[in-house]
UniProtKB/Swiss-Prot annotation:
Belongs to the RNase H family. Its EC number is 3.1.26.4. GO terms for biological process: DNA replication, removal of RNA primer. This is Ribonuclease HI. Endonuclease that specifically degrades the RNA of RNA-DNA hybrids.
Amino acid sequence: MPKQIEIFTDGSCLGNPGAGGIGAVLRYKQHEKTLSKGYFQTTNNRMELRAVIEALNTLKEPCLITLYSDSQYMKNGITKWIFNWKKNNWKASSGKPVKNQDLWIALDESIQRHKINWQWVKGHAGHRENEICDELAKKGAENPTLEDMGYIEE
């Protein structure tokens, strides 16, 4: 029986574009692990995606996951839009290349071995774990140490 994991994620960006950070809380039974990383130049949407990717990549085996995020962009992208993007060679309905394609591909790869129940939570609404993730993401953005490879200035 696969492990049942809860994951909470958030991304933050100071300036958008600007320095950004990710925050995540992973919970298995009574155990919790937190992630916080900061990137020099990025966007809020890239940080929302990267938070989920980083959290999923810490798991060592296939799991049953309930994943909570306050990002409609991430949730809609991975549960609705990605199917047509892949069919259309990573082009949006406008015919233009999908933004953040590198991270969508990475996210698509990182979900394949898991069964995920995607949940949207309202941000800044007193949801304990979302608030923790928000703080972790802000902390990362305030102390960036990493390059967001794939970020393209517009």
